């Protein structure tokens, strides 16, 4: 850990709860590696205190900060500008100081895309199937659209929530590419997709013996398809283990976490960030 002085610049993450965040681990590992005079700390902020907290961060000279649950949407009215990506996702996870106030973006889209882009596939011919229709699914939908996928299928458990999810993309070019399906349609979708993405929490502790996809359905996955789980612990999840048994290429959520963090840190410190240091710090911390 670098020596903290009167010149040390402050970064952080705000959430409720925030004690389980891995952001301080990976950001401080890179700060130490680059020998920067910064420190990254977690701030527990309740929803009703968000406005006061943001004013406080501004007053004490914080350079920038991340947001986690439940603040990714409610922060938006408190910012002077947000990026086009953040507007599409409807959530901000990274904020930095400007002359006109706070600006925000969403680095989850970049984080999600980074491991996929290395595969150099003809993405316009890939029709991803996304499990779940919550906040994480929104970043994945935007990422798939930015990658050039022409048809994006989102699978959920309740028609009302799916309809709301679909309508939320009105007046955006994404809605034309979007299809929504109920869970019972999954067998047919899995058999045809080249990219299956889990954005649900199924498979995380304490439900590590569960998968969002039944094994009978997973057996329909084509060999060589990609299975991507946004969950990073356990590593691998049951979802990824069973996909790998079908001959799938598997991607876990650890690189997405590191890549979105690296982009955020590069915005704040205005220099490139070694993603591999972030990834390794997470693997060391999680004993992976």
From Swiss-Prot:
Residues annotated as the enzyme's active site: 72
Pathway annotation: Metabolic intermediate biosynthesis; chorismate biosynthesis; chorismate from D-erythrose 4-phosphate and phosphoenolpyruvate: step 4/7
Keyword Amino-acid biosynthesis appears in the UniProt entry: yes
Biological process according to GO: amino acid biosynthetic process; aromatic amino acid family biosynthetic process; chorismate biosynthetic process; shikimate metabolic process
Chain positions recorded as shikimate binding sites: 21-23, 68, 93, 108, 232
Enzyme type, top EC level: oxidoreductase
Reactions mediated catalytically: shikimate + NADP(+) = 3-dehydroshikimate + NADPH + H(+)
Entry keyword Hydrolase: no
NCBIfam families xrefs: aroE, PRK00258.2-2
Complexes and interactors: Homodimer.
HAMAP family: Shikimate_DH_AroE
Designated name of the protein: Shikimate dehydrogenase (NADP(+))
Protein species of origin: Gloeothece citriformis (strain PCC 7424)
């Amino acid at each position: 850990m670098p020596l903290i002085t009167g010149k040390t610049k402050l970064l952080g993450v705000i959430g409720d709860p925030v004690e389980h965040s891995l952001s301080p681990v990976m950001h401080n590992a890179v700060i130490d590696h680059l020998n920067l005079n910064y420190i990254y700390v977690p701030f527990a902020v309740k929803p009703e205190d968000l406005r006061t907290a943001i004013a406080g961060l501004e007053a004490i000279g914080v350079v920038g900060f991340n947001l986690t649950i439940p603040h990714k949407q409610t922060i938006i009215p408190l910012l002077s500008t947000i990026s086009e990506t953040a507007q599409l996702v409807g959530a901000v996870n990274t904020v930095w100081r400007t002359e006109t106030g706070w600006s925000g973006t969403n680095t989850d889209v970049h984080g999600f895309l980074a491991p996929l882009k290395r595969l150099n596939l003809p993405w316009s011919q890939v029709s991803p199937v996304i499990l779940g229709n919550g906040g994480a699914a929104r970043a994945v939908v935007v990422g798939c659209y930015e990658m050039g996928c022409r048809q994006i299928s989102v699978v959920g458990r309740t028609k009302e929530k799916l309809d709301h999810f679909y309508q939320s993309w009105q007046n955006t070019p994404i809605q034309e590419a979007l299809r929504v399906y109920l869970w019972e349609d999954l067998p047919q979708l899995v058999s045809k997709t080249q990219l299956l993405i889990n954005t649900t929490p199924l498979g995380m502790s304490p439900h590590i013996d569960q998968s969002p996809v039944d094994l009978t359905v997973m057996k329909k996955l084509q060999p060589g398809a990609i299975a991507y789980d946004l969950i990073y612990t356990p590593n691998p999840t049951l979802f990824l283990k069973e996909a790998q048994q079908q001959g799938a290429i598997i991607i876990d959520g650890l690189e997405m976490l590191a890549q979105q963090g690296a982009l955020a840190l590069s915005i704040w410190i205005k220099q490139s960030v070694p993603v591999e240091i972030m990834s390794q710090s997470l693997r060391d911390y999680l004993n992976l």
